[in-house]
Design a protein with these regions (language model features):
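Residue-level signal for helical boundary/lining positions with a hydrophobic bias
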Residues: 47, 176-177
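Conserved, mostly hydrophobic/aromatic
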Residues: 180
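Conserved, well-structured functional cores that handle cations and Mg-NTP chemistry
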Residues: 1-61, 66-68
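An anionic, glycine-rich sequence signature occurring as long contiguous blocks
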Residues: 71-176
């Protein structure tokens, strides 16, 4: 397990933590985060971008207790917060719309606030939803073809990050993949 600092032009590995035999990944993650807080301090960064694997109330509360906000990619359509955000944003105008030049995508964003995540979490959250569209050009049999593509992303944010604009949540959510892509 690792922690990295992701910026548009720079990715820095901050720390590593092994997952012990018979140990839950979240336990190793909290050990890593506790050490990072001691080494770097609480103000080294404002928030963590967390994998969907950690969408659990107790884990997210532990991150907040360490002094950080969080955002997590929301993938599980069966979750009530996912369904509620989808229903509340349907038919609404986006709160922001732009062309993401680096990713070559057109991006409208919706921001749904004051949602209930889980009883065990106990605080409201917001969900930023993007519907990205782009044209992919391929050469097949010597001929250029253009294919329209679309993808939807949702990020859940803690209340501490409520004041950040939705485009920032979008950028931070996609920077999470800085090393892997």
């Amino acid at each position: 397990m690792f922690a990295q600092l992701n910026e548009p032009k720079l990715n820095v590995l901050l720390d590593l933590e092994p997952i012990r035999p018979e140990e839950a990944e979240a336990t190793a993650a909290l050990r890593l985060l506790g050490r990072m807080r001691r080494v770097y301090g609480v103000r080294f960064f404002d928030a963590l971008t967390i994998d969907a694997w950690y969408v659990q109330g107790p884990f997210l509360k532990a991150v907040e207790k360490l002094g950080w906000g969080w955002k997590v990619v929301l993938k599980q359509e069966r979750m009530e917060v996912f369904q509620e955000a989808r229903q509340l944003s349907a038919g609404q105008k986006p709160v922001a719309e732009f062309d993401a030049a680096r990713r070559q995508r057109h991006v409208p964003l919706w921001d749904v606030k004051d949602l209930t995540f889980t009883e065990s979490y106990g605080h409201t959250v917001s969900v930023v939803h993007s519907h990205e569209t782009w044209t992919e050009t391929k050469v097949l049999g010597g001929k250029k073809t253009h294919q329209q593509n679309a993808s939807d992303w949702r990020w859940m944010l803690c209340d501490q990050l409520k004041g950040y604009p939705p485009p920032m949540a979008y950028e931070a959510g996609h920077r999470r993949w800085g090393i892997e892509n």
